[in-house]
Amino acid sequence: LKCHQLIPPFWKTCPEGKNLCYKMYMVATPMIPVKRGCIDVCPKNSALVKYMCCNTDKCN
């Protein structure tokens, strides 16, 4: 699996066991990602932070 890093078009290949790409952003500024990369389990959203997770190459 290949996931974008914080600034596309940079990306990296995920290590074994991290089978999701994710994008984390603040609820107040949804168009500005705070963090991107590979993750094993999609974190829960909170009142301030949202996570978008997906399992195809460079989908974040």
Swiss-Prot record:
InterPro entries (alphabetical): Cytotoxin_Cobra (IPR003572), Snake_3FTx (IPR003571), Snake_toxin-like_sf (IPR045860), Snake_toxin_con_site (IPR018354), Toxin_cobra-type (IPR054131)
One of the GO biological process terms: killing of cells of another organism
Ranges in a coiled coil: none
Keywords: Cardiotoxin, Cytolysis, Disulfide bond, Membrane, Secreted, Target cell membrane, Target membrane, Toxin
Record's subcellular location: Secreted; Target cell membrane
Principal subcellular localization: secreted
Single GO cellular component term: membrane
UniProt GO MF annotations: toxin activity
Protein origin, superkingdom: Eukaryota
Disulfide bonds: C3-C21, C14-C38, C42-C53, C54-C59
Pfam family, one: Toxin_cobra-type
Tissue-wise expression: Expressed by the venom gland.
Function: Shows cytolytic activity on many different cells by forming pore in lipid membranes. In vivo, increases heart rate or kills the animal by cardiac arrest. In addition, it binds to heparin with high affinity, interacts with Kv channel-interacting protein 1 (KCNIP1) in a calcium-independent manner, and binds to integrin alpha-V/beta-3 (ITGAV/ITGB3) with moderate affinity.
Family: Belongs to the three-finger toxin family. Short-chain subfamily. Type IA cytotoxin sub-subfamily.
Record's miscellaneous remark: Shows very weak hemolytic activity.
Subunit-level organization: Monomer in solution; Homodimer and oligomer in the presence of negatively charged lipids forming a pore with a size ranging between 20 and 30 Angstroms.
Protein known as: Cytotoxin 2
Organism field: Naja nivea
